[in-house]
A protein has these predicted regions:
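Acidic, metal-coordinating catalytic segment for phosphate/diphosphate chemistry
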Residues: 1-34, 40
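Nudix hydrolase/Nudix homology domain
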Residues: 19-21, 58, 95-162, 388
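The catalytic Nudix box helix
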Residues: 45-46, 63-95
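A short coil-to-beta-strand element that immediately follows conserved catalytic motifs
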Residues: 89-97, 212-217
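ATP-binding pocket architecture of kinase catalytic cores
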Residues: 163-272, 306
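Active-site acidic catalytic loop and adjacent metal/ATP-binding pocket
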Residues: 167, 171-178, 183, 298-344
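Helix-rich C-terminal or lid/interface subdomains of diverse kinases
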Residues: 233, 336-342, 347-410
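Active-site catalytic-loop/activation-segment of kinase and kinase-like phosphoryl-transfer enzymes
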Residues: 246, 264-303
Length: 410
């Protein structure tokens, strides 16, 4: 039977109907559903379509879905298709942002959801010929190896790539995903106030920045924010350096007094905490260094943290810079935001970033010789944190590795 499907205009409004065969033959714009199914282990259900499908036969897919019928509510279509394709019923569906996709074979408005499911999966023989659970990382690794549905990769691939980068082994908080929300729960009581401070700081800060940042809201566990799409920066470019320069110029120009009032660690508190850290480094780390390194080490500890003039991210490295399609997709992890030295945010970019980044940064950020020198000092200080943490937690390998890096950078 040639079912009637709803046709949509460019704004996603129903504008008519047509037999499914006509919709396919003329590639008419319609509505379609897609549900990303995950289990409690975080794995995603992946399946292969049958050779008889009328579009993209025998391709791999990681969304359960189909066409919205004429007169059918899109949500009802989501529920129906999930049941028909995979035999999944009675689950809570988490709504994602709608999307649009078009190519030479199909054109539609996508109604996208995620759900959690640990029960059995029952394939519809006419639709699915194989299926299995895969970790997000393994699934992403197959994107270039297997022949996937291009629309699913375009619409839900960025979310899967983000899933693949998120782990719960953070020092300050554990993280887990629930649909399009990233939840964070403090691992220690002392961290909770800093997480909640982000719920005051980031809504004020986000509109002042040229790149996306998380805007958290409080939960019973800690905080949550909508997932920012992208993967941690691996390969640099001059263009990315320019974007980061524009971002840092905007960040360092915001009113520091207002930032502190809205939750950033104020200059006095940040300076006091840094003083404690530096004193502990003098007492615990310097004696572990060779005698010839004591004086330059003490001089370094005396120079850093002398300037506190701007709101800084305070932990800006590749793991906190998300990149999507060659552009900055987001700057994440603002727990350490404080009124501090802007050179701290330049440290990694000027001294350890991939090729091209520093040159691009210099095009959009005014880097003075004094600022460059201070950024180098912060770069030299970075391995001290690893040694300090290793001593605190009894991790001798971390201590040894950190001491070697301290000597290299001094």
């Amino acid at each position: 039977m040639d079912e009637l499907v709803a046709l949509l205009d460019s704004d996603g409004r129903v504008c008519g109907s047509a037999p499914r065969s006509v919709m396919r033959r003329e590639n008419l714009r319609h509505g379609a559903t897609g549900v990303l199914v995950r289990n409690s282990a975080g794995e995603i259900y992946v399946h292969r379509r049958t050779p008889t499908k009328d579009v993209y036969p025998h391709r791999y897919d990681f969304a359960a879905g189909g066409v919205v019928a004429a007169g059918e509510d899109p949500y009802d279509a989501v529920v129906r298709e999930l049941d028909e394709e995979l035999g999944i019923t009675g689950v809570e569906l988490s709504r994602l942002a709608e999307g649009d996709y078009a190519d030479d074979h199909t054109s539609y408005r996508a109604y996208l959801y995620t759900c959690a499911w640990d029960g059995p999966v029952k394939h519809q023989p006419e639709e699915v010929e194989w299926g299995a659970w895969m970790s997000p990382a393994d699934l992403v690794a197959k994107f270039d190896e297997w022949s996937f549905m291009p629309d699913t990769v375009a619409l839900l691939g960025p979310l899967v790539r983000t899933y693949a980068t998120i782990t719960d082994d953070g020092w300050d908080s554990r993280a887990w995903l629930d649909g399009e929300w990233l939840n964070r729960e403090p691992r220690r009581d002392a961290v909770r106030p800093r997480l909640l401070a982000e719920t005051r700081l980031m809504p004020w800060l986000a509109p002042q920045l040229p790149v996306p940042v998380p805007v958290p809201e409080p939960t019973q566990y800690g905080v949550r924010h909508r997932v920012l799409l992208g993967e941690p920066l691996e390969e640099g470019s001059t263009a990315l350096g320019r974007e980061l320069g524009e971002f840092l110029s905007a960040l360092h120009a915001v009113d520091p007094a207002e930032a502190a009032a809205r939750g950033a660690v104020d200059a006095a508190t940040a300076a006091a905490a840094k003083t404690v850290f530096l004193d502990e480094c003098r007492a615990q780390v310097v004696p572990l260094l060779p005698a010839h390194a004591h004086q330059p080490a003490l001089e370094l500890l005396g120079r850093v943290a002398a300037t506190r003039t701007a709101l800084v991210h305070a932990d800006l490295g590749s793991e906190h810079i998300l990149v999507q399609d060659g552009r900055i997709g987001g700057i994440i992890d603002w727990t350490d935001a404080e009124i501090g030295d802007p050179a701290l945010d330049l440290s990694w970019l000027l001294n350890d970033a991939p090729d091209g980044m520093a040159a691009g940064l210099a095009e959009t950020y005014d880097i003075t010789p004094v600022l460059r020198d201070r950024a180098l000092d912060w770069h030299r200080l970075a391995p001290w944190y690893g040694v300090h943490r290793g001593l605190l937690l009894g991790l001798p390998d971390d201590v040894e590795t950190g001491l070697t890096e301290i000597l290299t950078r001094l």
